[in-house]
């Protein structure tokens, strides 16, 4: 660690303590060149997911957008807030576990669709109709026919 007083890279750690939450490590150090004592803090750098939108703009992943989309699709349906939050948490965890730090909005939409299909077919249909941009009744009819074939 570079000494803030003389700039030397030679130091020794005198004391190490972990925070109560276990997320920060505090180290007391002494410069071997000038004897100056200083404190450093270490914490895990959190990974951040970036979403590539349809228009190729990039924005930070926002779990609340997933929750809002599912809430809208599942209005007046037998899906709890806890289930919706769990879906959003599971999608975020999946992306981080897979190391997908840059992901398309289409892929996120597909993950939501897959979960809703298992949970509630009506909410699934509502979500797909908005996400895939259904424009008229014919789009619904075609989708329902293909959905029924898969069942």
UniProtKB/Swiss-Prot annotation:
Pfam families: ATP-cone, Zn_ribbon_NrdR
Lineage top rank: taxon: Bacteria
Single GO molecular function: zinc ion binding
Signal peptide (residue range): none
UniProt keyword annotations, A-Z: ATP-binding, DNA-binding, Metal-binding, Nucleotide-binding, Repressor, Transcription, Transcription regulation, Zinc, Zinc-finger
Keyword set includes Manganese: no
NCBIfam families: transcriptional regulator NrdR
Similarity field: Belongs to the NrdR family.
Protein name: Transcriptional repressor NrdR
């Amino acid at each position: 660690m570079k000494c803030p007083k003389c700039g030397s890279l030679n130091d020794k750690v005198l004391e190490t303590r972990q925070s109560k939450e276990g997320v920060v490590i505090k180290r007391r150090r002494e410069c071997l060149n000038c004897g100056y004592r200083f404190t450093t803090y270490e914490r895990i750098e959190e990974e951040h997911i970036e979403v590539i939108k349809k228009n190729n703009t990039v924005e930070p992943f926002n779990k609340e957008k997933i929750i809002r989309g599912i809430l809208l699709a599942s209005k007046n349906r037998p899906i709890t807030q806890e289930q919706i939050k769990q879906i959003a948490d599971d999608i975020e965890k999946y992306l981080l576990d897979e190391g997908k730090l840059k992901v398309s909005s289409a892929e996120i939409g597909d993950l939501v669709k897959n979960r809703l299909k298992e949970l509630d077919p009506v909410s699934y249909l509502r979500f797909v109709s908005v996400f895939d941009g259904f424009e008229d009744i014919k789009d619904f009819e075609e989708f329902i026919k293909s959905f029924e074939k898969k069942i």
